[in-house]
Each structure stands twice: as structure tokens, then as C-alpha cells.
Amino acid sequence: MKSDIEIARSCAMKRIEDVAATAGIPADVLEHYGKYMAKVPLSLIDEDRVASNRLILVSSISPTRAGIGKTTVSIGLSMALNRIGKRSVLALREPSLGPCFGMKGGAAGGGYAQVVPMEKINLHFTGDFHAITSAHNMIAALLDNYIYQHRSEGFTLKQVLWKRVLDVNDRSLRNIVTGLGNTTDGLPAQSGFDITPASEIMAALCLADSEADLRRRIENMVLGISFDDKPFTVRDLGVAGAITVLLMDAIKPNLVQTLEGTPALVHGGPFANIAHGCNSLVATKIAMSLSDYAVTEAGFGADLGAEKFLDIKCRKGEIHPRVTVLVTTLRGLKMHGGLVGGEPHEQERQALVEGFANLDRHVRNMQRFGQPVVVTLNKYGDDTEEEIALLSEHCKMLGVGFAENNVFAKGGEGAEDLARLIVETIDRQGAKRIRMAYADDDTIEEKVNKIARNIYGARSVILKKSAEKKLVRIHAWGMDRFPVCIAKTQFSFSEDPKQVGAAKDFDITIRDFVINGGAEMIVAIAGDIMRMPGLPKIPQAEKIDIVRGQIEGLA
């Protein structure tokens, strides 16, 4: 089979104004980035259409390092809905350069279920990540300058919380010292870098519903702590307007297309393990305004991305998915059942059955939120009919719908059965309100405990002393009502990536809380998770090259 990039190049793209026309977007509102990409205005949001849309959330079992294929299935499903006569628009996150050149590779789908132009989307796209990186680091520079220029007046901060960001995987930047050299080179300070998808500006942009809301959120971002234990914010720095100006274009969603011409809004890119893992609220609302069945994705497994989509994004945006689709693979289930590789067939079968426990917990979790659930198998060429039948029968026992899909090889045609099942499920179940995992007025400790115990299956939550100190501050600053975003490994329900399947008898250790006053969430750091990833021994960058003017090896 052709590579992803070869498939993408072999399919003729429509001009972006033609894609816009299929979604009912007037050509004169498009801001073109070449022939095949454009930004669209927030004025396209129609709250009445949003309220009536049959939003479909795509999530998955806990992923393996080989991936599960949520983005590919999301793209294929939206194309399939259009193929069966429904009106569908897709909303996805933007890829990050860090994983693209690191371990994961690109994030524009795969096979015959891709968004295009895939090279541009996977690389610099329309510059949103650059704008977010620039805005975040501009705040860091302005804060350092403020401290430097006002030191003669006795001004200083007890603690600076604001780090810098960069859209690369670079472990050597996690902890740095700035301001070395002469006295004119700034004041020495211990700091560090996070990856751009973990930036609070990324989160705020993805949760803001307007430019004014984004400016308000930027004003409230906490940069440091004064000696009287008060928050020092961007408002105190007096630069919220300047930072918002840097993001004026970045807040507008990007319109592209799938290989079959389905309109796709690709906008924002927080990771689900270290951030809230959803594309922008405005992109989702525009997709809902332009269609009857909007399809969107939440990152990693349902314990991370879907929980945060429902508890954070839906709480803020007052949107309600009509169904959650859980993507799985036989290979992934076997790995959750303890399969290492090379075992005899009978051991593979047993591993598959034992791996069902991971799927079961994700199904129960989504049902806990009041979500109707459909399970879809992302098919591989070596899947056997016997094993597929086992999974189908197991889903029947769980009382949830099941459909295979083969969108990687067949595009939208490979998900038509899945699309019909989803439409039937939505029609049968009707609209249901989300049952959130916690209430707004729960304390931060209660929110963390409810997620850890009820969603992850943890025995208890252990708070490190540093986390306990942060909680005192959160209480004192009146931020208890913020939702909680737990940063945790994506490979396990626990904080240990090696505990696959449905982990039991484990505790969740919270070692720190990050106060996101602008994004209006409290990030709880669980276990050893890092907000600046490192590169693997053999990064994807070694496979990428340019040959006779064409990019090769990007996947």
C-alpha cells in the first residue's frame, strides 16, 4: 500500500472556496492561506444550530505506543456520514511539531482517511502554534523586564511561575537558568520550558468563545506570587492587549478538507495527557453550526481526553455530545491483556479476552457520564474473523453497539456501517444531559478524588507536600470552582505506564498543582508526567527528507 504522503498527493484537492461552499460558508469571509487552506470568522457560530446538532465524540481505549487511530476514524466517520446522505463537518486538533519529529509522527489521519494538505497541516500550517509560542514567550520576556526595571524600587516576586514554551520535544530545556552574564543581562533565575501544547495560552485560546473572552482570560493568567502571597497576573503587567493582538489571527479556526472533500476545521492543539486535549471550542461550535452531525475527537483514551472534553470543554461551552464512539484495535486489546509479541495463537486469544477489561472500564466511564456508547474496531490486515466475532459478542454482552471500520484502506466507504449505527443510536437514545464527574462547588481535592476513584479506578489519592501548599493558595485565591485537568500518563489508568489493562489496587500521587487562572482550570500533575517531552532513541526526524523538491517520510 502507498504511504500516507503518497496517498495524499494522489488525491485531487478542491480549492478551499469550493470546500467552503459545500459547508455554506460565503467565499468573501475566507482569509486564504494559499489555494487549499483558509481561516474563518467566529461570526459563523449559530447557537441555535449548535443546540440542535448531533455532536459525535470520538475517543478510545487506553492507547498503546503503536496508536489506536482515533484521528483516522474521526476523519473516515465524517466522510461516511456524508456518503450516507447526512450533513457532516469535522473538527480536529492541529498537530504539534514535537511528536511529528519525535516518536508519534504526524496527526493528519492515515491511509485514505486524511485531512489535506497533510504536509502543511503537520508542519507550520497557518502559524497558530508560532503565534501561541510567541505570545507565551513575550509574556515571559515582559515579566523578566518588569522585574529588572523595577528592582531599584524594591519590587520582586517571591516566586515566578511562568515558564517559556517551544514546540519541540527537548528534555534538556525542562530546567534552565536564565539571566547569566553581566548585570545588564538580566537577573539570574531558575526556570524551564514546556512544550507549546501545554501552554496556558493554548488552553485559553481553545476554551475562549470570542476575542474579548480571550483577552479577559489572558489578563487573569497568574505569572508569579508576591511576598504577601497574592497572585501577580498579566493584568498587573499591563500587557493583555498586546498579547491578544499577537493572537488575533490564531483564534480564528482553520478550514481544510478530507481526501473526499469533507470540510474540516483544524484548530488548537493541547495534548490530553498534559493538558485538556481538545480542539478549540469555537471550531467545534462552527462545525456544529454548519452541519447536522459534527464529528470531533478528544485525545488519548477516554479516561483523559473524553473526561476532559465532558468535564471542562462541555461545561464551559454548554455543548453536549449525543454519542461517544470508542475506537479499539485487536492489537491494542491484546497488549492490554499482556501480549508481548510472538506468542502462539491460543495465547493471543487469551490476551484479547483479558484485554477486554480495559475496554469495559472505558465503556462504563462514558456511561457514567450519561453517554450512549458505540464501539468500533479499527481493522488491520491480520485481524481474524474469529477474534472480531469475540469482540462483537463481548460488546453485545455489554449492551453497546459495535461496528467494524476500514477507513485506512477504504476511506469513507469503510465506515458506512459505523455511520448508520451511530445515526440509529442517536435517533433511538435522543438528547441526554451530561452527568459531570464532579460539581462546580466541589473542592479541588474532591474533584481530583472523584476522577481518580470513579474514572481511573484508583484506591486513593496521595498529595505531596508541594501540592498541599498549592492547594492552600488555590483556596485563598478563590479558584476552587475551576475544573480540574489531571496530567497523567496516557498508557494506563494508573500513573504507571506499565500497568496496562484495567489497573487495580493503585494510588494516584499528585506532586503539584499548576494554577491556570486564564484558562480557568487547575492542572494536577500526577506521577512522573513531564510537560516537556523528550525525543526517543530513533526520532521520526531521521525518516524525513526533501527529495527533488518533495517532502518524504512524513507520516
Give a label for each model feature:
Residues 1-555:
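Flexible phosphate-sensing "switch/lid" loops adjacent to ATP/NTP-binding sites
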